[in-house]
Amino acid sequence: MGRRGKKKGRPVSGWVVLDKPVGMGSTEAVSKIKWLFQAEKAGHAGTLDPLASGMLPIALGEATKTVPYVQDGAKIYRFTVAWGQERSTDDLEGPVTKSSDLRPAEAEVKALLPKYTGVIMQTPPQFSAIKIAGERAYDLAREGETVDIPAREIEIGRLDIIEHHADHTVFEVECGKGTYVRSLARDMGRDLGCFGHISDLRRVEVEPFTSEDFVTIAELEAARFGAQGEDKPEPADDADAIDVPVDFGAIDALLVDTSAALDCLPQIAISDDAATKIRLGNPVIIRGRDAPVEAEEACATARGKLVAIGAIEQGMFKPKRVFAG
């Protein structure tokens, strides 16, 4: 008897702007979403720690080609720093490594904010996904090693105090790619002489998505299984498709269009004939009074549908990344 082949997922495309719950890892979330949609491909646009909640944009199908544009977008976090303790993981998960009876006044915290605004150098946490000699820093840290992680340049657009209390402060930060909020808590605690760690972390925005795009696991399950409720099937370990005919219309309606990730690029409307040529990898002349002559990157669309990302050189659109029609 021949071996049964692994089933191929659906060619569904779009973004799931998941409101990830505390306790779920980013990889686990991607597997869950891929299974719910029975998608052929899936990937996320920036890890969110299991102890954090909030926005985890997950790309399905053709949308995976736009992941780098979301990864480069600004992010907004709301987080709480508990004063008086530094922990090995810089959050609640690790043991206490340093402690202090000192607690900062709001004026002291406020005076520190300019130091952490703008382009700054930041050292990632020991427990991070940074690679050191080919190994993840968190793997080395779990083995008891203290590794030398070089500081790197990051950008913080703003850092605001939302609430201040005797033993903790709630902040909101808008930051660029590569920023570790846990490092912010650690470094501010050291500067204030009282130590600190993250006790609550929520990502509220990843450009270009907003909280209006949020969808929860419960909402996705309701759309996928409807009246099945608690009798819904559980995902297999390999996330293969289930052998039950399914209407995916309700859950697919919760997807954000693939093109939403490319709002940062110029949009060029082209004809159906031009779209056919581009999908075959051929350059086309861009027509129209307002068409740009030069652009490092632009999106070509036909009838409102994304066709390709490419460069415009001397009035010619040259595709770099083509999307299925």
UniProtKB/Swiss-Prot annotation:
Active site positions: 49
Key word tRNA processing present: yes
Entry superkingdom: Bacteria
Keyword field: Isomerase, tRNA processing
SUPFAM superfamilies registered for this protein in UniProt: Pseudouridine synthase
EC numbers: 5.4.99.25
HAMAP family, per the entry: TruB_bact
InterPro entries, alphabetized: PsdUridine_synth_cat_dom_sf (IPR020103), PsdUridine_synth_N (IPR002501), tRNA_psdUridine_synth_TruB (IPR014780), TruB_C (IPR032819)
Claim: Transcription is one of the keywords in the record: no
A Pfam family assignment: TruB_N
Function: Responsible for synthesis of pseudouridine from uracil-55 in the psi GC loop of transfer RNAs.
Single GO term (MF): tRNA pseudouridine(55) synthase activity
Protein name in UniProt: tRNA pseudouridine synthase B
Reactions this protein catalyses: uridine(55) in tRNA = pseudouridine(55) in tRNA
Annotated source species: Mesorhizobium japonicum (strain LMG 29417 / CECT 9101 / MAFF 303099)
A GO biological-process term: mRNA pseudouridine synthesis
